[in-house]
């Protein structure tokens, strides 16, 4: 469904939001912020396979979330229990738009920064990197 992205052939750094992108969003709406430690994170269909595909290709997987830094421990536990693999976790980035700015490499063709917007809870299974 998504057009493949043509950029440099080197491994890439993939920034991925957690809630509504890799895992179902409704669980947080049902439980609320005050019962965060009781959330049962459910990966969206195809998430685990896609993350392993990216990892096997040598890509760096960085998860981002608006969850506060104080929720790091429980978030890491939820990710592990759900089978979601990653290299880094960036917490507390808020709920506003995310903007990535990067320089173009003078000796290479192609973009060095890309944005993919997905409808909530559609997941990453059809994303081609």
Predicted region positions:
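HAD-like aspartate-dependent phosphatase fold
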Residues: 7-129
């Amino acid at each position: 469904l998504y057009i493949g992205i043509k950029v440099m052939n080197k491994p890439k750094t993939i920034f991925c939001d957690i809630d509504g992108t890799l895992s179902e969003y409704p669980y947080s709406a049902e439980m609320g912020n005050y019962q965060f430690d009781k959330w049962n994170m459910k990966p969206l269909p195809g998430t685990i396979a896609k993350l392993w595909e990216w990892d096997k290709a040598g890509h760096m997987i960085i998860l981002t979330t608006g969850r506060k830094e104080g929720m790091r421990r429980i978030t890491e536990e939820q990710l592990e229990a759900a089978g979601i693999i990653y290299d880094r976790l960036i917490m507390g980035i808020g709920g506003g738009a995310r903007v990535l700015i990067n320089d173009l490499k003078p000796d290479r063709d192609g973009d060095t920064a890309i944005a993919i917007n997905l409808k909530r809870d559609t997941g990453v299974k059809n994303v081609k990197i």
